[in-house]
């Protein structure tokens, strides 16, 4: 009888411990913010979302960039030269509720796109875990990951993810689809596991 009582207590304690752990895990709120012009960064954001859950949010501007590629390039060059931060149409209510913030963007002029600078400047991410992810035309992330770290000095910035996407200049738009999307999913999952953020699904 005594042994049975002890066993019952141990089972109860284990159950409570497991429930507590599950509640902590489910309470880890994730925000996945991304800027995407050709759809490639969006594709990566959606893969992350499928594997981590959380809220998926596209960054949109009050005044969108021109549809014309060269016009957008010229505008971004001026914004980078002057330090102009374009106003965001996208708003995040109660940023304090999120513990983990993924920030996705393409490489523009080998730099962090101005709208992403706007986002990281507008919201206080102190004490949060920030994880950058990127798509590019084959020339890499440039200074973009360093810029994220510089703008998030009071955050824990984890190892970023980067993948080659389209080349809008050459008319190659959304390329992360079909077989390339499947390959990207494998790479994203591996990265999430390395950072300890892959969901147990």
Locate predicted features:
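Bacterial N-terminal signal peptides that target proteins for export
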Residues: 1-8
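FMN-binding flavodoxin-like domain, especially the glycine-rich phosphate-binding loop
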Residues: 11-31, 35-60, 81-105, 109-201
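Charged, often glycine-rich, active-site loop that binds/positions anionic groups
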Residues: 67-81
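Short active-site-proximal "capping" loops at secondary-structure junctions
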Residues: 61-65
């Amino acid at each position: 009888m005594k042994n049975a009582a002890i066993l019952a207590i141990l089972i109860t304690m284990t159950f409570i411990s497991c429930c507590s752990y599950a509640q902590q895990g489910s309470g880890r709120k994730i925000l996945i913010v991304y800027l995407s012009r050709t759809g490639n960064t969006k594709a990566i954001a959606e893969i992350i979302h499928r594997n981590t859950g959380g809220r998926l949010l596209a960054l949109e501007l009050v005044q969108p960039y021109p549809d014309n590629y060269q016009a957008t390039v010229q505008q971004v060059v001026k914004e980078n030269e002057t330090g102009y931060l374009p106003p965001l149409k996208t708003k995040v209510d109660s940023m304090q509720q999120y513990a983990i913030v993924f920030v996705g963007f393409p490489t523009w002029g080998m730099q962090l796109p101005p709208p992403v600078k706007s986002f990281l400047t507008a919201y206080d991410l102190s004490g949060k875990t920030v994880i950058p992810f990127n798509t590019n035309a084959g020339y890499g992330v440039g200074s973009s990951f360093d810029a994220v770290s510089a703008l998030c000095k009071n955050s824990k910035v984890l190892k970023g993810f980067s993948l080659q996407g389209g080349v809008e200049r050459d008319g190659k738009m959304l390329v992360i689809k079909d077989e390339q999307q499947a390959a990207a999913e494998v790479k994203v999952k591996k990265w999430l596991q390395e950072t300890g953020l892959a969901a147990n699904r």
